[in-house]
Each structure stands twice: as structure tokens, then as C-alpha cells.
UniProtKB/Swiss-Prot annotation:
The species this protein was found in: Brassica campestris
InterPro entries: PsbO
Family, as annotated: Belongs to the PsbO family.
Keyword entries, A-Z: Chloroplast, Manganese, Membrane, Photosynthesis, Photosystem II, Plastid, Thylakoid
GO biological process: photosystem II assembly; photosystem II stabilization
PANTHER family associated with the record: OXYGEN-EVOLVING ENHANCER PROTEIN 1-2, CHLOROPLASTIC
Record GO cellular component, one term: photosystem II oxygen evolving complex
GO MF terms held by the record: oxygen evolving activity
Cellular localization per UniProt: Plastid, Chloroplast thylakoid membrane
UniProt name for this protein: Oxygen-evolving enhancer protein 1, chloroplastic
Function: Stabilizes the manganese cluster which is the primary site of water splitting.
Length: 31
């Protein structure tokens, strides 16, 4: 992916959180 590496830790966490909630893997990843 050609995304610039300017993501902050919070942005990465938010992105992961949204992806996890969107795919339903939150049930598999208790973190």
C-alpha cells in the first residue's frame, strides 16, 4: 500500500478497532 507513514499510534488503533468491529473478529481478539 502506498499510504504515507504518518499514522499516529491512536490512528492505527482506531483503524484496527474499526476493522475488527466491521469484520466481527473482535470476538476472536480480546485485545
Amino acid at each position: 500500500e502506498g499510504a504515507p507513514k504518518r499514522l499516529t499510534y491512536d490512528e492505527i488503533q482506531s483503524k484496527t478497532y474499526m476493522e475488527v468491529k466491521g469484520t466481527g473478529t473482535a470476538n476472536q481478539c480480546p485485545t
